[in-house]
Amino acid sequence: MPKLVLLRHGQSIWNLENRFTGWYDVDLSDQGINEAREAGVALREAGIAPQVAYTSVLKRAIRTLWLSLAELDRMWIPEIKDWRLNERHYGALTGLNKAETAEQYGDEQVHIWRRSYDTPPPALDAEDERHPRHDPRYAGLDPQQLPGTESLKLTLERVLPCWEGEIAPALRQHDCVLIAAHGNSLRALVKHLDGLADDAIMKVEIPTGRPLVYELAEDLSVQRSYYVQD
């Protein structure tokens, strides 16, 4: 029975500052570093040993992966970085303080942008320096693939091909796969795995730095899921 471990990155500096982060590449806070290490300790104590790991191309997820694998003494396992596991892109809200954004646009509008399934925030202009087409880590991609904003629905549409083409095949070859990624890319995956309705996924929160384990059947259907640190 293969296991899939979903690990949201530890608290980032912009999580701490209550800012919309999205694809902006901020690092972990001191608390986030501790959370990542504690996640690795929890997995080790639970006897869970990933054989291959996936992460995004953003340092808060990559560093979370490294720190947790160090505690597991498994930094040697294969590690695949895939941009499709990036956080949801918050468009023109990127970098803004969430409370100040609510004051500017109103609580209801910001709530819709953050919590509706298919309503994205205002998009970044393609010439905006925050747009991913100006970031060298995406230079090999078709610019049309790079979002200027995303809803959770659009996030799922890019995560799903990564799941089907990369992660699901890995689960058929290995007993345990670890994904260190982001709140919304992991929520998109949870929606798919658990078959949740659009409104149901909006109530799901994934905490930072707490490993969520899925035990899967041979056909990768979910048998049960649980947080290791519960």
UniProtKB/Swiss-Prot annotation:
Residues 128-137 have a biased composition (Basic and acidic residues). Gene3D superfamilies: Phosphoglycerate mutase-like. It catalyses: (2R)-2-phosphoglycerate = (2R)-3-phosphoglycerate. SMART domains: PGAM. Residues 117-143 are annotated as: Disordered. Its EC number is 5.4.2.11. The record marks 182 as: Transition state stabilizer. Catalyzes the interconversion of 2-phosphoglycerate and 3-phosphoglycerate. Homodimer. This is 2,3-bisphosphoglycerate-dependent phosphoglycerate mutase. It comes from Halorhodospira halophila (strain DSM 244 / SL1) (Ectothiorhodospira halophila (strain DSM 244 / SL1)). The lineage of its organism: Bacteria, Pseudomonadati, Pseudomonadota, Gammaproteobacteria, Chromatiales.
